[in-house]
Amino acid sequence: MTIMRKTHPLLKIINHSFIDLPTPSNISSWWNFGSLLGICLIIQILTGLFLAMHYTSDTATAFSSVTHICRDVNYGWLIRYMHANGASMFFICLFIHVGRGIYYGSYMLSETWNIGIILLLTTMATAFVGYVLPWGQMSFWGATVITNLLSAIPYIGTTLVEWIWGGFSVDKATLTRFFAFHFILPFIITAFVLVHLLFLHETGSNNPSGLNSNSDKIPFHPYYTIKDLLGVILLLMVLMILVLFFPDVLGDPDNYTPANPLNTPAHIKPEWYXLFAYAILRSIPNKLGGVLALILSILILAAFPLLNSSKQHGLIYRPISQTLYWIFVSNLLILTWIGGQPVEYPFTVIGQIASILYFAIIIILMPXANMIENNILKLXY
């Protein structure tokens, strides 16, 4: 008698994805972050659903409804802070996941990589519209500043901004539609995640050695289910430490002041996970140029498979590229720091240098390092 999970039409799909999936025997803990992102997405959808039951998307009551959730709803404070800090954990896992993809050359699985870029963009969009919903000062002004960037588009810009706002300023219509977007986008993300997995399972996972692992595969369950479970426990532990001890450490104090169109906060800035892109945007004096740089800061990831000319897969045996990679990571951290600083000397100059370096490493320095390393290989043999 055949096992049901191998014959049942629905269970068969789950079986081929999570149970009998042939997996390289040597993938390290850096490969745990895919499953952690799945857990984060589930946490966000569940907590978000319960928040939506009590939230009202009206400018008069939005701020009060969030306060009501925290004060009057059973464990409302827990759900709210799990959702807010869950987003931060989501982005930490996302950045590590992308970083691992760059380090180990996983971008050569180009369909999976490109769907991943779409996922990153969609997640950032979801986080942005979600940040507007509590209708605090930073919510309102963040929405005003970021949506206003679209006015830089020639000819149709102003019309486009007013169309998104649903009026002549960020107001009730904007909040209502942002709530609608914030509700639907996670389900679109879930659909893209399934496509991401579909493409991944067409080729199989990459592995730290960068070699073909077809000759040495093991079933996903029980080996990697147990391994992923450790990651999940650690993730939940860090999340709960954040939620229960430091719930506001990653937030902005300005968001505890209700939105006031007549009073601009001293420093308008988005959540920490969008700061690197915000720093790149601010470092260009021209408005349209800044918007293009902002979009390119994410889309540049699509250039990795195109610019790669290395004879080796991944950076594990490539010291020059490795050095550049860690400079790139440090540069990203500097950009994140600069994005949260006021627009004044010396922060502006540091931001401009870091922005130039961000693009230069990917477009100029990495390909050049590839060529040098290929030549060193020729000398060796």
UniProtKB/Swiss-Prot annotation:
Heme b b562 binds at residues 83, 182. The chain crosses the membrane at residues 33-53, 77-98, 113-133, 178-198, 226-246, 288-308, 320-340, 347-367. Heme b b566 binds at residues 97, 196. GO terms for molecular function: metal ion binding; ubiquinol-cytochrome-c reductase activity. It comes from the Eukaryota. One of its GO terms (cellular component) is mitochondrial inner membrane. InterPro entries: Cyt_b/b6_C, Cyt_b/b6_C_sf, Cyt_b/b6_N, Cytb/b6-like_sf, Cytochrome_b, Cytochrome_b_C_euk/bac, Cytochrome_b_N_euk/bac, Di-haem_cyt_TM. Binds 2 heme b groups non-covalently. It is found in: Mitochondrion inner membrane. It holds the Pfam family Cytochrom_B_C. GO terms for biological process: mitochondrial electron transport, ubiquinol to cytochrome c. A ubiquinone binds at residue 201. It is a multi-pass membrane protein. Its cofactor is heme b. Component of the ubiquinol-cytochrome c reductase complex (complex III or cytochrome b-c1 complex) that is part of the mitochondrial respiratory chain. The b-c1 complex mediates electron transfer from ubiquinol to cytochrome c. Contributes to the generation of a proton gradient across the mitochondrial membrane that is then used for ATP synthesis. The cytochrome bc1 complex contains 11 subunits: 3 respiratory subunits (MT-CYB, CYC1 and UQCRFS1), 2 core proteins (UQCRC1 and UQCRC2) and 6 low-molecular weight proteins (UQCRH/QCR6, UQCRB/QCR7, UQCRQ/QCR8, UQCR10/QCR9, UQCR11/QCR10 and a cleavage product of UQCRFS1). This cytochrome bc1 complex then forms a dimer. Heme 1 (or BL or b562) is low-potential and absorbs at about 562 nm, and heme 2 (or BH or b566) is high-potential and absorbs at about 566 nm. Belongs to the cytochrome b family. This is Cytochrome b. It comes from Abrothrix longipilis (Long-haired grass mouse).
